[in-house]
């Protein structure tokens, strides 16, 4: 059997958040060789090989087809350049590892409030000094693409090997493009975010390689994983209401309107979006239905996984998707 190879972060906050997400989904990461190992398996999910890599190495491995799935920031995936969407498919945003890729200018540039202003400054700088405005960044691919879309041409990239936010103060650049979460570090270095200079609002993504080899059994394992994480994610937004069987008629009439807002009938009750739970309970009480119990489900599984079906279609493996549906 061909194993499903998943790359996960090997260190830092992203590693901790990824492990917490897996554990919340009922999957425990077991690292081979102790805490310093670089391979692992997922307890409860056979047929899966886990590789622990840096965030940037995960993006590289996905792009090259060395792994099937990976968890890393969208910012490092996008930095692979070219038509990356033809090589890597984003399956699920994970809700952590959030950061913005932004253009930041010195706070002393009080008249710079837009990328159009940046272009004006760059043009004047070139006319005055004969040199292009220097932009320090580790994200050259996305910077060039964004500046092109914004019509900024009179600049040059300075590759940043260290703390990018210190480049203007050090005299090695006039502007920077960097990742920020709160903007506090930029402010501490007397920099401001250009209001329309947000290049990407990034977060951790579960992504799939479109260049890897995907035999049917590998797609089946991926479908099993997605069923688990989707089932857990779906359950977090739902509440389950149950009532005595003898009240089923009036209960169904009382909750009919909720079906138009994401509620789903069950043989013994109703699944409703969590934010509608109190309204649904009140509607049942007004109809004389009771007692009504409310639970939060651990998982809510659907008959199919649209994400894996979309992946199979991108891979040209519609038949593999059918095989997975029959076998999982």
Where are these regions (language model features)?
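Small-molecule-sensing regulatory modules
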Residues: 2-47, 52, 71-100, 109-119, ...
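N-terminal low-complexity or amphipathic/hydrophobic leaders
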Residues: 51-56, 63
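Conserved, well-structured functional cores that handle cations and Mg-NTP chemistry
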Residues: 58, 68-72
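Short alpha-helical basic/polar micro-motif
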Residues: 59-60, 168
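Alpha-helix C-terminal capping/helix-to-coil transition sites in glycosyltransferase folds
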Residues: 64-66, 172
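Periplasmic solute-binding protein
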Residues: 103
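Short, hydrophobic/aliphatic alpha-helical segments
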Residues: 123-124
